[in-house]
């Protein structure tokens, strides 16, 4: 049972003017995530059903564990949805390495997060292109690929991508490891014409594994 104070906090969760960051009428939803300021689901806790651009505004100095109860979310290293991205699908994350362990980088900060409104695992489709601006060889994808090269893609880089439906997470290395880039059909109109549009942390066009995001 939630206390009256907790219920009031849930009613005053921060919102954002960005249409892509919060659930919209008719979207799949609902979304629900619970964050904790200590590892192993200890300490202060707070539930969210919409995006949070800065956990420090909710009196959290960091998120050290969390539970995703419904929907899919993106966690960010910094405030305002910037820095490293972490895919957060339904389940429990007792420590930072549960959401960034396969990242291959030691990042213990998670300061903002938002729901992924376009995730649709069964009907996801995207096209990857050899070069920027949708030029060169292309390949349509509608399944999970732990190794693009093993499945026929000719190198370890992708120049640009079009997301026709759903939401995807692309990884720097095979086996879903390395930097994570979450690409959605309702961001940029689904068009990512250059690797710099994959996220504020993007430093390379290297992509070697791709999978659909579970809703």
Swiss-Prot record:
One of its GO terms (biological process) is negative regulation of phosphatidylinositol 3-kinase/protein kinase B signal transduction. Specific cleavages in the N-terminal arm occur during lens maturation and give rise to several truncated forms. Cleavages do not seem to have adverse effects on solubility. S-methylation and glutathionylation occur in normal young lenses and do not seem to be detrimental. GO terms for molecular function: structural constituent of eye lens. The modification S-methylcysteine is found at residues 82, 117, 185. The modification N-acetylmethionine is found at residue 1. Residues 1-30 are annotated as: N-terminal arm. SMART domains: XTALbg. Pfam families: Crystall. Residues 31-70, 71-117, 124-165, 166-214 form the Beta/gamma crystallin 'Greek key' domain. Residues 118-123 are annotated as: Connecting peptide. Residues 1-16 have a biased composition (Low complexity). The modification S-glutathionyl cysteine is found at residues 82, 117. Homo/heterodimer, or complexes of higher-order. The structure of beta-crystallin oligomers seems to be stabilized through interactions between the N-terminal arms. Interacts with CRYBA1. Crystallins are the dominant structural components of the vertebrate eye lens. Belongs to the beta/gamma-crystallin family. It is linked to Cataract 10, multiple types: An opacification of the crystalline lens of the eye that frequently results in visual impairment or blindness. Opacities vary in morphology, are often confined to a portion of the lens, and may be static or progressive. CTRCT10 includes congenital zonular with sutural opacities, among others. This is a form of zonular cataract with an erect Y-shaped anterior and an inverted Y-shaped posterior sutural opacities. This is Beta-crystallin A3. It comes from Homo sapiens (Human). The gene is CRYBA1.
